[in-house]
Every structure is written in C-alpha cells, then in structure tokens.
Amino acid sequence: MQQVARNEQIQLAPMIEEIFTDLAPLAEKNGIALEREGDGVMIGSDALIYRMLFNLAENAVKYNRPDGSVRISVAQEDKMLHIRVADTGSGIPEEFRRSIFQPFFRVDKSRSREYGGVGLGLSLVWEIAGLHGGSVWVEESSERGTVFAVELPAQ
C-alpha cells in the first residue's frame, strides 16, 4: 500500500457510530451489542481510518459468541490516540498473535467459508496504522475475548 495518508481532520466518535450502523445487521443477527466510549481527533485519510476501524469491528462481531458484545473505546492523551476494540469471543491463541497481521493468514482455515473473506483485513489494519504513524497489536486475548489496541498520533 503506497498511498500517502491524506491530511483531513477526523472526528472518531461519529465515524465509529457510522461503522456500527453498517455492522448492525450482522450484529443483530448474532445478538451482539455494539458499544462506543470516548472520542478523539486526528489528521489523516478518513477513508483509510474508516477501513481500519471497520475491519477490526467486523472481525470482533464475526468471531464473537452469540449474545456477546463489541466495545470500541477512544482516549486522547497528549499527542496520541489510544483506541481499543474489545470483544467477548473465544480469543486468539498466543502463537498466532503476530501472524494474524500477515496477508492471507487465518487462525482456523476450516472456518473461512463460514466467515468469508480471504485473510486480508488485519494486514490492511497493520498497513493503515503504519501509514498514519501508528501501530496495532493484540493487547489481550483469552477465552473471555480479545482486545486489539491501536495507537495513532492525534491532531
């Protein structure tokens, strides 16, 4: 991905609400509650940041338990945005927590038909965070769920 991030002011709370609206049919089908907390402002490409957050949220919905929840929280501290995408799914095994950001990688290839996609979502998340001077990682994962953390420069 060679595109340079555009310099647009991005307010994250309305963007997250839009993502939740787009994911509502999938979430409702599985009884997943969507929750947002906090807000922040950054400079970058609104289309790319939307794609990054959408991919994280969509995975959190798709790989969740029935009647689970997805929470996106945003905190702005000094010159950094701290974004957490937390779900109540079954977690990501420790040995795969770095590999999941590689293109076409899947933790469980046998489930790819069930969930769709080709395994590019998290590699795009990694690239988009990097294009904006940030980073993404699995902060926590257990049988109670997973938390992805993203840090990006704030406005």
Model-derived segments and spans:
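Short alpha-helical Gxxx[C/S/T] motif in the catalytic ATP-binding
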Residues: G116, G121, V125
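Short beta-strand/loop element within the Bergerat-fold HATPase_c
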Residues: D67-K79
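Short conserved segment of the HATPase_c
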Residues: I92-R106
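Conserved glycine-rich
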Residues: G133-G134
